[in-house]
């Protein structure tokens, strides 16, 4: 039986071929530049895709929570890093997880470092998260007093090992000058490595964001790359210039429940619950929550005619449909 015939409600469809191509491409890029690829797994969140990743030499991953790390543990990863300022209320869970999986966490203040040093029961590595302009979280790269304080606290605990500096230049997602942002980020990490390398000769620097890692060709002295969205990509990454539409490895199969020919609209069962509410603003000011592809048993085809999801609520989605799509679709069909 066709897999499409088994779909009755909004269903995620993944292309293994495209996913593997994306993993291989980024792995080759990292290797070509002499960097270690440690991808962020918060988008893919899949043990199976992780097994594919290891076929391309990927041995460590990053996630965003203890819960996700628990799910991904015992899958053969050399280390799982939690790339979110460590939540000290989860120390008991971290202690338990660290007994079965090598872990590293992110520290952004001396208070967290103190609690970790006092209560850890198993060895844990840590990165100090650095802010070089994004402004969301992290220690300002020029705030060496805070960095020194964190390192001093950690030096008194045999279970807490300094691994290096982590920087996520998330402002590349706002369509600014990605090359300039990456240059500033590399410079910040280099200045810190130059300052602390004598005391910590094995310290690493890690830079992670898909828009930058996908297009930049000069990573300087950064040791590790940590992009995440590149595994599947999406329309936002297309808009940022990170990839082509053909590189997007996911779509959502949705049932057609109504068609309004006079308004050129198609109502689908697929809304914010299924698509999230990320949105692209088009040149005419209209909102685009996703573009339509045509499903078949081998995956999907990107049509030459353009149709897109113009609005969503929790369960509903409304497609602004092309004439060609309106002429070919019926209530009960599936679209991607």
Across the structure, where does each feature detected by a protein language model lie?
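Generic N-terminal amphipathic, Lys/Arg-enriched alpha-helix
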Residues: 1-14
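Conserved, mostly hydrophobic/aromatic
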Residues: 19, 42, 72, 128, ...
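Active-site-proximal beta-alpha core segment in soluble small-molecule metabolic enzymes
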Residues: 38-175
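Active-site loop ensemble at the mouth of alpha/beta enzyme cores that anchors a bound cofactor
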Residues: 213-295
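C-terminal accessory subdomain/extension
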Residues: 263-336
């Amino acid at each position: 039986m066709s897999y499409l015939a088994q779909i009755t409600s909004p269903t995620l469809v993944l292309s293994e071929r495209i996913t593997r191509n994306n993993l291989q491409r980024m792995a080759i890029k990292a290797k070509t530049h002499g960097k270690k690829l440690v991808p962020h797994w918060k988008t893919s969140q899949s043990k199976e895709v992780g097994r594919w990743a290891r076929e391309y030499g990927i041995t460590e991953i990053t996630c965003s929570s203890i819960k996700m790390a628990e799910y991904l543990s015992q899958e053969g990863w050399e280390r799982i890093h939690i790339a979110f300022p460590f939540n000290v209320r989860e120390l008991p869970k971290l202690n338990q997880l660290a007994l079965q999986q090598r872990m590293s966490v992110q520290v952004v203040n001396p208070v967290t470092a103190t609690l970790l040093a006092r209560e850890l029961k198993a060895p844990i590595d840590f990165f100090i998260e650095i802010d070089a302009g994004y402004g969301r979280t992290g220690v300002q790269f020029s705030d060496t007093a805070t960095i020194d304080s964190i390192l001093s606290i950690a030096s008194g605990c045999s279970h807490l090992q300094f691994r290096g500096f982590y920087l996520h230049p998330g402002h590349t997602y706002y369509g600014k000058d990605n090359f300039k942002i990456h240059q500033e980020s590399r410079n910040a990490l280099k200045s810190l490595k130059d300052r602390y390398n004598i005391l910590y000769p094995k310290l690493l620097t890690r830079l992670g964001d898909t828009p930058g890692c996908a297009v930049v060709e000069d990573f300087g002295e950064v040791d590790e790359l940590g992009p995440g969205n590149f595994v599947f990509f999406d329309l936002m990454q297309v808009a940022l210039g990170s990839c082509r539409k053909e590189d997007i490895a996911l779509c959502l199969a949705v049932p057609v429940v109504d068609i309004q020919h006079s308004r050129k609209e198609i109502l689908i069962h697929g809304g914010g619950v299924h698509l999230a509410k990320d949105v692209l603003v088009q040149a005419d000011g209209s909102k685009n929550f996703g573009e339509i592809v045509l499903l078949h048993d081998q995956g999907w085809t990107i049509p030459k005619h353009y149709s897109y999801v113009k609005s969503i609520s929790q369960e509903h989605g409304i497609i602004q449909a092309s004439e060609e799509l309106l002429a070919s679709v019926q209530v009960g069909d599936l679209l991607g």
